[in-house]
Amino acid sequence: MSSDPGYQAPVVTVSSSIPRRGVGDSVLIVPVVTRDDAAAVLAAAPFLDKDAVREIEAALKSLGATGGEGQTHRLVVSALPVASVLTIGLGKERDEWPADTVRRVAGNAARSLDKVAAVLTTLSALDLEAAIEGLILGSYRFTEFRSAKTAPKDGGLRAITALSQESKSRARDAAQRATDIATAVATARDFVNTPPSHLHPDEFAKRAKALGEAAGLEVEILDDKALVKAGYGGIVGVGKGSSRPPRLVRLSHKGAVRTRTRGARTGGSKRVALVGKGITFDTGGISIKPAANMHHMTSDMGGAAAVIATVVLAAKQKLPIDVIATVPMAENMPSATAQRPGDVLTQYGGTTVEVLNTDAEGRLILADAIVRACEDNPDYLIETSTLTGAQTVALGSRTPGVMGSDAFRDRVATLSQQVGENAWAMPLPEELKDDLKSTVADLANVSGSRFAGMLVAGTYLREFVADGVEWAHIDVAAPAYNSGGPWGYTPKGGTGVPTRTMFAVLEEIAREG
């Protein structure tokens, strides 16, 4: 991450035609489809003349191109002023193109042009915002810890010209929105990809503060002494084993319409609480994890990263609602001072908990944060976390699980699917609460069963949500971190999920309540 707050996106401009000058080093990205078993140029008019289209299609025919989704070909086209053309396949021709298909193929195109500084594209004629988001997210790279020996010699993608016939004002607003959303996702990725040696709780809090203040947010940070004094037993308990003490960060966007006299929210303005798990590294504590793949636990603050990025995005987009993020941060380490299996701690608000497994630490810090967030009297609460390995077992590496109050849970899942993050609604059966009974405290932090682990964790969190608050818990244990190869606009490493889901929910609440 640079010394400037947050990720620096490529410069985006929108044009109604291909410039005749100044694009000699640029690559033009052109979508093609499968038509009669061959590749055909899509969205050509009015940007490409007939000579350019004929030249492109003739070259593709000679190469045996079919226009299959993700298929790319680099061509030199004499009829165009650009250095080269990259065709990107969309698959079989259709009347309408889903936004995430456009986003995904734009990401594929950007990844195939990783050494190109400037691009133009007609993909934006299909969906302006999706094309810009896909290009920015597909071009993302994390190089902060590369020395001169291995750092890329080029600067990556720095300029995007999106070709569109939208009105100037509409195009300008859409391009800015897309850039802001992609920047938020990339910022969350940067946090996740930063190693725990450089992103311990205090440093994480400082970076969150810098981002928040740059966006005009109100920022509050509680250090370890303040946490002890206020009774945040979950956060303090988890952080006891580390030499790097915990923090609680609060970031507030006050966008709701207020009365002139008392400054109170008007009746139609909503308040949304965001809560994100910020375990900067998770060894499991005394209940230590296996060594294999423990290095992936650098991503155990993926929920916090997404929440911070989302509240900053809400401020940039000036959403007319209040959004208050409550982000607990701790490092879960084994040591002589660490909490032990069998210890009892008191969560913020007074609930006592028997800690049967110190590797179920996320729910302990989240419970504190949820109770604190509910003191702000939100209408809605969204919590997200890399909470359980059971999410991966149940839903795989790309599908978040959403639990919570039924109507709001379904609303979150639906919007997540619309933006391409593809969360799936899951139940919280009442009988699972019995599995969290303790003989010595109000609750145990785990059940005695290996079944339904994702749902049991959600059931635990439900105990701390105030009555009357519509809430959703998004488990992104696997989706927050791509341990495999890149695909679409998703790189290896931090993904930024579920930033776009949460922002989509905030936008809908701002529109509809």
Swiss-Prot record:
Binds 2 manganese ions per subunit. Its cofactor is Mn(2+). Mn(2+) 1 binds at residues 282, 359, 361. Mn(2+) 2 binds at residues 277, 282, 300, 361. Its EC number is 3.4.11.1, 3.4.11.10. The active site is at residues 289, 363. GO terms for molecular function: manganese ion binding; metalloaminopeptidase activity. It is an enzyme of class 3 (hydrolase). Its main location: cytoplasm. Keywords: Aminopeptidase, Cytoplasm, Hydrolase, Manganese, Metal-binding, Protease. Presumably involved in the processing and regular turnover of intracellular proteins. Catalyzes the removal of unsubstituted N-terminal amino acids from various peptides. HAMAP family: Cytosol_peptidase_M17. Belongs to the peptidase M17 family. This is Probable cytosol aminopeptidase. It comes from Mycobacterium sp. (strain JLS). The lineage of its organism: Bacteria, Bacillati, Actinomycetota, Actinomycetes, Mycobacteriales. The gene is pepA.
